Amino acid sequence: FTEQLTAFEVWLEHGSERKPPPEQLPIVLQVLLSQSHRLRALVLLGRFLDMGPWAVDLALSVGIFPYVLKLLQTTAPDLRQILVFIWTKILALDRSCQLDLVKDNGHVYFIRFLDSPQVPSEERAMAAFVLAAITDAHPKGQTVCAQSGLMQICLSHLPQASSPAGSPLFVRWLCLCVGKLWENFKSLQGEAFLSGAPEAIAPLLAHPIPDVRAAAVYALGALIYVPPDRVELDTDGEGDDGEIKEDAEHSNSDREGQRGGQRSGLLDADRAAAERTIACQILPGISDASPLVRVETAVALGRLACVHSMLFQSAAAWWRRARSGGGSPRPSSGAAGSSFEHEGDGRLAAGDRPSLGESGVIGGGSFDSGR
């Protein structure tokens, strides 16, 4: 084992994508089973994966996944940083292992690492990235991470991370992590509103780092619940089973939370009022100097327009008539939408906005470790 690791280390010094792959790679994976050589093997594997996506793809092709998944069951503190780094590289390229991670409770390993104050913020940011990848468009991952208290942990670390002495990288991934966690998760969104999550994130809209501001806009915009579209039938008349399953998983988790006594529900009027507050908070982002912030603001407002389309259309029609000198009164809103209405100036519907069908740069794009 020692000779094989040394040979692999020599290859790392001189190898590249253009050269033949290392012959020792399958053996190095076997070395992970040896406790005495495990740390050195993991460090060398981390160096190899850091050479680029081609290295990650090669490692996956020779079967690295079951080995590093098994290691998440260990409690050795000296392995934690390098394991989190390796999983960051894997999930940046391949999200297909979401289900296996959740099935084996691998998410708990990263939540504990994230909640370790003695670990440097930059390393905990990698754990936040991994958890964001686990919950990205994955209802089962969202449910189990929420049940493990991920939302409360992320919010509890925001004040220190966003302080002048904090890490902008860490605070950015905390925002992205909670945004992915509660996106289209209605009961968790209700719990977030009731626990003051928007108030904890809103100060980050004035952060000097544009990426942090954009992540904060995304996290706030993800609190706006957009009901799933109707299941579209294909040419054979069969529905999208995956979409039905995802909706059912969230519905089941919502019911379980209610049976457990969690205050996860909001009245429609209260939710509309909370969404109106979010809109007012993020609205200045349309004139932000950063294009990334402006894009995320447009996407968040697009979610709002999707949910309250009738109110937006009514307000836009009123605004056009008022601008042309018609002098017509403000449109009336129903009971469910009245709390959403702006008093006085109707700025939320100031003009026609194009329909937004695409996700934002942060909210909808694929994850990468450099972001």
Where are these regions (language model features)?
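Short coil/turn segments at helix-helix junctions and helix-capping linkers
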Residues: 32-36, 55, 70-79, 97, ...
